[in-house]
Structure formats: structure tokens, C-alpha cells
From Swiss-Prot:
Domain of life: Bacteria
GO MF, one annotated term: rRNA binding
Entries under HAMAP family matching the protein: Ribosomal_uS3_B
Name assigned to this protein: Small ribosomal subunit protein uS3
Function per UniProt: Binds the lower part of the 30S subunit head. Binds mRNA in the 70S ribosome, positioning it for translation.
Record has Ligase as a keyword: no
Compositional bias (Basic residues): 240-251
Basic and acidic residues composition-biased segments: 221-239
Organism (species): Chlorobium limicola (strain DSM 245 / NBRC 103803 / 6330)
Record flagged with keyword Ribonucleoprotein: yes
SMART domains on file: KH
Amino acid sequence: MGQKVNPTGFRLGIIKDWTSRWYDDSPVISEKIKQDHVIRNYVLARLKREKAGIARIVIERTTKHVKINIYAARPGAVVGRKGEEINNLSQELTRITGKEVKIDVVEVIKPEIEAQLIGDNIAYQLENRVSFRRAMKQAIQQAMRAGAEGIRIRCAGRLGGAEIARAEQYKEGKIPLHTIRANIDYASVTAHTIAGTIGIKVWVYKGEVLVQRIDAIEEDEMKRMKDRRADSKSRPRDPRSKRRRSRTKRA
């Protein structure tokens, strides 16, 4: 199943966290989920013109306000001159949600290994008639130079304007999809070209997480087992237990 399931959903609650971090058991929960979808689409559409490079948008809710964390490769494009862009964005989102909106912009340190940004970059190049092989290979080289342990990119559709659709993929390093502790960043992007739409999927392996914690748990368990064995050997045996064994054998 590791090869089929979405790598992010497969690891949610273990090493990955949700992008909507709030809880509600009221009947209007569906409206809030729909509102999150509207917020994300609006922010992405507005900041796409600024070429801010949005990796992900995390939404947190309380009873009084909505907090939005925007992870961007170019945070200056989100903030704007003297904070004009972020203030206008906050006002528009307040109008949409009906609550006070607080926006925090977080800079993405290594955009070369963010799956969403890689997919967006390849889609942009394909829409501008760049060779798909060249775009894929350049993205792989940049990701491996930036510190990724493995990357796989798959493009499917009318590649190069061909009449028959096909799929091609390139891979470098390792992508352990079955290992739950493996931190794999995944993104799916659609490029709208003259020949039609091209689907782009990106897997980036950034290394293992929880390794130290798992090793510590295993060491503690081994230590406990050794202590139990030592205690059992040091305890004097009850002579009555031998008598009971002999009686059971005679019976």
C-alpha cells in the first residue's frame, strides 16, 4: 500500500501534521472546511502574481480569530512594501471569514527540496514550452545539491505535444515509501499547456525522523529485560517449587 497511498496522508498523526489545525463538533463543521478551501484558493491565486513561492498554508482557528501561517520561499513578496500586501490580504480574509484574521509569514529555508515548489516550478516551465526532460533533470540536480536524500518526479500527459499521452519519470537517491518514519514530502501539480493538461507528481525524501527516539525506547526495553533476567537469577529458588514439580511428574 505504500506505493499507492498518498505519502502525506499515510504519515498523518505520526510524523506529519494536518494543515487545518482546529476541532469542531458542531453541525457547521462542513462550512468551516469549505471556508478553509476558499481561503487557500484565494491566497494562492492572489500571491501567484507576486511569485512568492507558496509551499503550504496552515490554518488554525479559535472562537474569536483565524490564524493563517503562510510558508513562502519569498516572504518579502507576501508582506509587500511597508506591509501593504499583507494588510490588504488580512482585510480581505476577514471579510470572507467574518472573524479577525492573523497572518504569519514563515520563510522556507530550502525551496529546492520542497515538493510543492518543485512541482510549481516544473509546471511553470512546461507552460512556457521548456522541454519536460530538461525541467525534470534540473529539478532533481538542484534538490540533490540542496541536501535531499532522494527524489522522484513523474510527468504524465501529452509530453512534448505528442498525439498519444504517456508517462515518464526520473529518480535519484532512495524513496522508502513503506517506511513510516521516513520524512517524504509529496506534491501533485497540474500544468495547463497548449496540447492539454500534464500531471506532475513529486516525491522528496528528506531523511528519517524519530530515529533517536525509537533507538532510546529500544535501549530502555533491552535494559529492562536484562534487569529482569538478573533479578530472576539472583532470587533464591523456593524448595517447595521442586516438590510441586516432582508431584506433577508422578501424577
